[in-house]
From Swiss-Prot:
Gene3D superfamilies: Lipid/polyisoprenoid-binding, YceI-like
Domain of life the protein comes from: Bacteria
Residues in the signal sequence: 1-22
Principal subcellular localisation of the protein: periplasm
Keyword Membrane: no
Entry-linked NCBIfam families: PRK03757.1
Organism this protein belongs to: Shewanella baltica (strain OS155 / ATCC BAA-1091)
Upper lineage: Bacteria, Pseudomonadati, Pseudomonadota, Gammaproteobacteria, Alteromonadales
Protein name: UPF0312 protein Sbal_3041
Entry's transmembrane regions: none
Amino acid sequence: MKKQLLSALIGASLLAPMAASAADYVIDREGAHASITFKVSHLGYSYVVGRFNDFSGDFSYDAAKPTAAKVNVKVNTLSVDSNHAERDKHIRSADFLNTSKFAQATFTSTTVEDKGNGDLVINGNLTLNGVTKPLAINAHAVGEGQDPWGGYRAGFTGTTTFAMKDFGIKMDLGPASSHVELDLVVEGVRK
């Protein structure tokens, strides 16, 4: 009996390293395989669309246990780009992002919900304009695998919406323009 138990323990200890575990990834911003874009309704007739050109982050992910995933992102708010220099200057002002005081926004996940078929809800805290609030991102695991350069990558998309007033942005653009929609594309390179 002792020999069988010992054999089982040895066998289990040999198999343990083969069990799936979360891998750590760094967001591939140098290869331009990630983006943070936003859109805000313009008077209810159209949209102002922009992006943040400078951000960084990392995440851990295991497809076998997506609820254990973790995400951390830092955004340089000075890098906002709506393809219009004067508007960008206004977005950076105290009317909106107040980048002279708050040059960085952050998102840190707290929990991840697995909705099946690669769909996830990433719950976390967004700090923007000096205000931290909970935010849920509807995400989808696009895929993962070896790249042609000997690395391993995982990619995701995500969307979320938040009210500007929740983050201390009091500029009144009218009721049709009170929310910001974020579209996220993330490709990470395994560390």
